[in-house]
Amino acid sequence: MAPQTLLPVLVLCVLLLQAQGGYRDKKRMQKTQLSPEIKVCQQQPKLYLCKHLCESHRDCQANNICCSTYCGNVCMSIL
């Protein structure tokens, strides 16, 4: 392939990647967005809770809810 055609092909590839949503992984972007059922926690969690992350209320034990904090989504007691 001639050197003059390499640059247009490269530009075309970059433009196609941007049209598809860029370089970011769509699943990673979906995880960073809050689920409609997960709300911001009312209180600051204890530091040990940051080791036990959750994705939904089903991941938590009884009398606990999954809520969003500075360290991610954690299970916190509702009592």
Curated annotation (Swiss-Prot):
Top-level taxonomic group: Eukaryota
Record's subcellular location: Secreted
Keywords, sorted A to Z: Disulfide bond, Protease inhibitor, Secreted, Serine protease inhibitor, Signal
Cellular component GO terms held in the UniProt record: extracellular space
BP terms from Gene Ontology: antibacterial humoral response; innate immune response
Secretion signal span: 1-21
InterPro entries: Elafin-like_sf, WAP_dom
Domain WAP, chain residue ranges per copy: 34-79
Gene: WFDC10A
Protein name: WAP four-disulfide core domain protein 10A
Pfam families according to UniProt: WAP
Cystine residue pairs: C41-C67, C50-C71, C54-C66, C60-C75
MF GO annotations: serine-type endopeptidase inhibitor activity
